[in-house]
Amino acid sequence: MFCWEHPKRIFPQYPDLTRQQFSIWEGVSHGFLGKMSPSFPGIAPTILASRSIGLNYPTIAGMLVLPFMGFFYPGNPEEAYVRAYETAFFDIGYAREATALLSAAQSLAVIGCEPDFVIEEILNLDPLSLGGSFGKPYVIASLPDFLLDAKSLTGVDLAKYLSKRLSHYNVFDPFRAIVIALLVSRAHSDDPWLALQVAVNQWDLGQNGSPRRFADVDCYASITGSLLGAFCGSGSLPLQQVEKVLESNRQVYNIDIEITAKRFIDLILQLSSD
């Protein structure tokens, strides 16, 4: 809401574009606060709060907006899970579980736990009792088959497996994203640069199984990267490649990632102190 109401505070040079970008959050944010939305007159706040960011299916929004939550609760996966779940008020369905599990995994990875141990721990994590009479929560109930099938796969073979095995999931599906993050981190936690290459080489396949286009690969890389950072540390990527990415974003998009990150951190600290 703050970004939508005060776009000049976020990107002073692009207030209109900023407001437009954050408009997808306006409806659900007003609804969560129990208020009517100026963009959706006549729709009750309870409905606005349940419609996510305007899509009626689970998405990766929470994992993209909260990729840092687990770092706040090192060694405390249950607390990381609960806080991420609470904060992702805009997620619906198992998207909130996926967001919470990513946070829990980070909280363990950042204290030095190995990927296999982290995965085993989160498979038994349900502090909010999301499971019921019919079994475990969706994400942790569905993960084991993928973990077993891909146990020996790495590199190109893993990328191909993930593209094919997850092809029936929407490209924005949170389960698809967390499967990629976990399997890639397990296979290549010793080589985060290769891990990111596997994460970004994911295809959206047609009905006959042939590649149509890349899936939502930048988002998969961001989500996977947030977990790899916990496993490997911020200085584990090749400096030359980091500089290349920073410069490419400056040249192509006129975005300085380092300045934007600092502005975001400063804004969070400011809002936290208000």
Protein language model annotation of sequence segments:
Residues 1-274:
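Structured, active/binding-site neighborhoods that engage oxygen-rich ligands
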